[in-house]
């Protein structure tokens, strides 16, 4: 039973990872989102993972070359685990050569040739910048011994990242029965890439790549938009998928991720992603509300070797909120017992911290003791007994 409430903050600091139900409440006071002309879309706050607006976000759709995000993610995990090195030299096999390969007809290529010797780093650039299907195959052969084995690795990371709408059948994203993902899952994957690939993520912002005397431009036209600070991620297109785009924009210390699937044209996908990102930047703030180890209040503790105990949280918590709601944010902590009695250990949960927008609960976090309090001496405990029972 929750017995004590204390008001300790009246907004201008906030945020964190919260439950889906509370996350929806957190944006319930947001301004009207833009109308998006696409099959599915998501705007996600990078820091918190909160979805700020979305449409058909869990609809299973053809990812096309957005599949290559998972290909690159698996490559980076292999590097992290020291199975391979970015400087390893890969000998390109025949199945990665477009010549006489009907699978690659009319598709995006790095223009590798059988027998080429290319570093893992350069193949990764070819995968990301050129969207090279041949680069995907060369990397899959090198890391897993073949495409089916590499696809199995991709799907193992689907499970690890809890991508419930996603299944891969190819390493490159060309149309294949049973291959699908969703705008939401691709936003989650993009967030994992940005967080987990600091040495490779810069490749997503490269505007061109020259290989074998051929210079190709990155198909993400938003990289040239100087007003948006876009630094990734990827485009995709097949006749079955339509025009897909994932774009990430940095605004000061904030980052947003926009996913657009099934747009009508390459320019159309850029326009829809731009609308989402601009709306998010204009209307939301991502701020820290709680600091790990920082006291949010203190309470009387009975029968201890001190009279007060400091309370707070063990983690840093962030949250994305509509800017217009900042003046209306308040937080309280609530004890889960009538009184606190010693001895009590540090890091013990004794209640909850509650965040309100106006009168609406939008987030909760554990309230814990920040210090231990031992049992007091006989005379202090006796004094506490008479005070407590009075």
From Swiss-Prot:
Binding-site positions, substrate: 234
Listed name of the protein: D-alanyl-D-alanine carboxypeptidase DacD
GO molecular function, one term: serine-type D-Ala-D-Ala carboxypeptidase activity
Metabolic or biological pathway: Cell wall biogenesis; peptidoglycan biosynthesis
NCBIfam families the UniProt entry points to: PRK11397.1
Reaction(s) catalysed (UniProt annotation): Preferential cleavage: (Ac)2-L-Lys-D-Ala-|-D-Ala. Also transpeptidation of peptidyl-alanyl moieties that are N-acyl substituents of D-alanine
Coiled-coil ranges (or none): none
Subcellular location: Cell inner membrane
Signal peptide: 1-23
Gene Ontology cellular-component annotations: plasma membrane
Organism: Salmonella typhimurium (strain LT2 / SGSC1412 / ATCC 700720)
InterPro entries for this protein: Beta-lactam/transpept-like, Peniciliin-bd_prot_C_sf, Peptidase_S11, Peptidase_S11_C, Peptidase_S11_C_sf, Peptidase_S11_N
Membrane topology (UniProt): Peripheral membrane protein
GO biological process, one term: proteolysis
